[in-house]
Amino acid sequence: MADCAGPSSAGRKAGAPRRSRKAAGTKQTSTLKQEDASKRKAELEAAVRKKIEFERKALHIVEQLLEENITEEFLMECGKFITPAHYSDVVDERSIVKLCGYPLCQKKLGIVPKQKYKISTKTNKVYDITERKSFCSNFCYQASKFFEAQIPKTPVWVREEERHPDFQLLKEQQSGHSGEEVQLCSKAIKTSDIDNPSHFEKQYESSSSSTHSDSSSDNEQDFVSSILPGNRPNSTSIRPQLHQKSIMKKKAGHKANSKHKDKEQTVIDVTEQLGDCKLDSQEKDATCELPLQKVNTQSSSNSTLPERLKASENSESEYSRSEITLVGISKKSAEHFKRKFAKSNQVSRSVSSSVQVCPEVGKRNLLKILKETLIEWKTEETLRFLYGQNYASVCLKPEASLVKEELDEDDIISDPDSHFPAWRESQNSLDESLPFRGSGTAIKPLPSYENLKKETEKLNLRIREFYRGRYVLDEETTKSQDSEEHDSTFPLIDSSSQNQIRKRIVLEKLSKVLPGLLVPLQITLGDIYTQLKNLVRTFRLTNRNIIHKPAEWTLIAMVLLSLLTPILGIQKHSQEGMVFTRFLDTLLEELHLKNEDLESLTIVFRTSCLPE
């Protein structure tokens, strides 16, 4: 027992120093961890204080750059301790206080434009002037952007270990831009873009939906080879390829179905005849037309090889005209450029169709509209104003040859025994020639004899009852009631009259055109305005015959001016009249008209009738 107790007590004595050493190591480790944590905390606090200090210094520099007297050395020194965001704040703050955004400029901002874009007629470009509004000139804007591009973008508190950049300022001799250029459209496709389509796609074209949907074509090469300008090779060079394809298709046809033997033999014959075609002469159409017709008549809609041959022939003729050799294109790139060229072809076709307008048709329509307008305007008072107060027209109407109308039953019915004055006949003749004459003047149908007989009997009965004292008249009471119900209304004044408004519109349109026509006559608009106003007062104006285009108003002014020249005392063979005639001839040539066209419009107001 004693022997057993001895070793156990010795083991307990040996374990006590081991536990004490372990406790001492744990205490020492915790002390080191606390020291590291406090050290890291101190370093973090120092870094935060350093960051705050640099930010405070940068903000102080921003405040200093808001002053007016800034030197170049101070500006380049400040660029080492600020970021582009700080410099942008400087530009904004200076523009708010109406100073130029460039710190070296001491000028004040004038009137700031409100628009966002500016069109430069010098460079034919559109610029975004949002940032340009903060500067007094294009040079200050360019110099400011030049300096801002040199400012480092790294944080200001980590620049101690970096090398400071050498700032440079823009010289005053160099010109600036009006703002940031706006790209209105993509650039045209060049040969270099075709050779390197990936670069072209990144710059000018967004990814299409077909590219994202087709995952199998992602690894496909866009172009097997390039498109090179030059002469096309003869069709004999592609004949072996077509012949080889036809043989391959022939073998596949024998394996699949024996019904295509005749068709394949026809394709081989066509391929051999295609080799004799020459692209640089007109024999191609005559040589290749019959084989193609033979293929089209014998091949069905399911056969693909003849269709490919026809498509290849069409592509050959197109490329022969453009003198471009197509070595090879993948399906993806072919679809891409097919969409591109289709859009350009649509634009060119729309422009060409809009340009191809027959001038003769437009000329006839213009003269027709003006004749109808002048005929509607003309009244009996117009002819009296032009040819005198004692003017009276007789049966002859010169405008009857100009306006051809079909007579209806209302126009045929007339009273040959009527003895109206001459001016009443001319008034009726003018009214009949108007195209907008309504059906209100038509003769009403005669009432039936039975109705007239009944009305006569009723009238006789009323008369008998009235004389017997049994009939009471209700007319006076009804009239008094009507007068009480309806309030009295005043007639329209001249300013509110529709006719006066139309005359004012016509005079306003003519006043814009006549000053240019009066230059050869050496008179002003005020000299003829009274006569023109009196002439317009005699017109019959509606809401439709006063709406015309500027070219039509020019011709109307020429017609009216030629009518007023005798009244103004200007003779046709005088010097002013001859100059005016030559001027009208030149103006008519610019409008693609002749002197006869103007005469056909003027003759509407002239007649072969004699004065009374």
From Swiss-Prot:
Stretches the record annotates as Disordered: 1-40, 193-267, 292-317
Gene Ontology terms, MF aspect: protein serine/threonine phosphatase activity; RNA polymerase core enzyme binding; RNA polymerase II CTD heptapeptide repeat phosphatase activity; zinc ion binding
Protein name (database record): Putative RNA polymerase II subunit B1 CTD phosphatase RPAP2
Biased composition (Polar residues): 294-305
Annotated gene: RPAP2
Cited InterPro entries: Rtr1/RPAP2, Rtr1/RPAP2_dom, Rtr1/RPAP2_sf
Keyword Transmembrane assigned: no
Gene Ontology terms: biological process: PERK-mediated unfolded protein response; snRNA transcription
Biological role: Protein phosphatase that displays CTD phosphatase activity and regulates transcription of snRNA genes. Recognizes and binds phosphorylated 'Ser-7' of the C-terminal heptapeptide repeat domain (CTD) of the largest RNA polymerase II subunit POLR2A, and mediates dephosphorylation of 'Ser-5' of the CTD, thereby promoting transcription of snRNA genes. Downstream of EIF2AK3/PERK, dephosphorylates ERN1, a sensor for the endoplasmic reticulum unfolded protein response (UPR), to abort failed ER-stress adaptation and trigger apoptosis.
